[in-house]
Amino acid sequence: MAITHLYGLIGFPLGHSFSKKYFTEKFGNLGLSQTHAYEQFPIPTIEEFKGIIAANPNLRGLNVTIPYKQAVMPLLDEIDLAAAQIGAVNTIKIAEDGYTRGYNTDYWGFRTTVEFWDKFKNFESLKACVLGQGGAAKAIIVALQDLGFEVIKVSRQASEETVSYEELPDLMEEIGLIVNTTPLGMFPKVDDKPPIPYELLNKQHYLYDIVYNPLETAFLSTGLENKVGGIYSGLEMLHGQADKAWEIWQKKLS
C-alpha cells in the first residue's frame, strides 16, 4: 500500500531529533503504518524548503526545528495568528495543492507542562528568566506572560530588551524560574551548560530545560547540587507540542 500521508522534520542538523521515532510509533498505534510515514529532511539552507514540498506531493505536514523556526516564515503561504504574534513557526500544515500554513505548538507544549508541574504552586516568585533568544524562546516568553510571569530575557549581549549573563547575579534574588532554551548541554556536548551564577541558586529557584537528550542536563544536575526547588526536563514539552501538531495536521485547511 502506498504512503499517502507523509510528514517530516526540517532543520539542521537533525541527529538530536526524537520526532521520527515518536510519530512512527504513533502511526503504528493508530493502525496507520501502511499509509502514513515520517521522514527527516536535514537541509543546510532554508532555500531548500520549497524543493522538499515540490519533490514530495504526498507531504501533508512538517515540524520545524533549529535553526529555521523564524527563517521559514516568509516562505509560507499563510501564518496562524498566534504564530505570527509569537514570531516563530514550528509546525506546518500542507494541503494537497501544496498550500502551506504555519503554526506554533511550542507554546502549548511549554505552557501545559508548567501549568501541570506539581511544583508550580510552590513558586515564591512569578519572575522568570529565559536563556536564549531563538524561535523556541519566543513561544516560551509568550506562554510565561500568559501565565502571569514577568519575563527577563537573557542573551550573550545586553540590549534594550535583554540583559547579559554578566548582569544575572544582581537579579537572582528576584527570579523564581529559569528556562534554558539554548542547545547548551545537548548530546554529544553533555558537559556544556549556560553561564548562569549557579552558586547563587537556592530553593526559591526552579529550573526548566527544553533540551531532552540527556533527560538530566548539566544545567539541571548543577541546579540539584545547589538545592533548587525543582527541575523539569524538556521531554514532556516535546510530547505536548508533537501531539498538538498531530491535531493540527488532522484538520482540513479552511
Where are these regions (language model features)?
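Rossmann-like adenosine-cofactor binding region
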Residues: 161-232, 236
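Glycine-rich Rossmann-fold phosphate-binding loop(s) that bind the pyrophosphate
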Residues: 12, 132-134
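N-terminal Rossmann-fold NAD(P) dinucleotide-binding loop
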Residues: 137-138, 216
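NAD(P)-binding Rossmann-fold cofactor-contacting core
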Residues: 146-164
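Short helix-loop-beta connector
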Residues: 120-127, 201-203
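Active-site capping/gating segments
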Residues: 112, 116, 228-253
